[in-house]
Amino acid sequence: ADLRGANLRRADLSGANLDYSCYPLWCGSLHLKADKRLACQLAYHLCSMQCDDADYIKMRNSILGFANQFHRADECGELKEREI
């Protein structure tokens, strides 16, 4: 499905396979319903960012266990803690 311009606010994406897709980062995608698979995938992508901010690194390290449950973590590589 072509979701360009779609308002995903409060959308239920539980069970959706969003591999190789683009997640919109605008207000219309806030408050969606997701299952653990998608939440881990989004957390993994968040944790894979190269950001040197101390607050980001603290947050990142605190959710690594969850993020590394991403269904493709074996293929993409387990993320390790970073020092501040």
Model-inferred region functions:
Residues A1-R4, R9-I84:
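Intrinsic low-complexity/IDR segments
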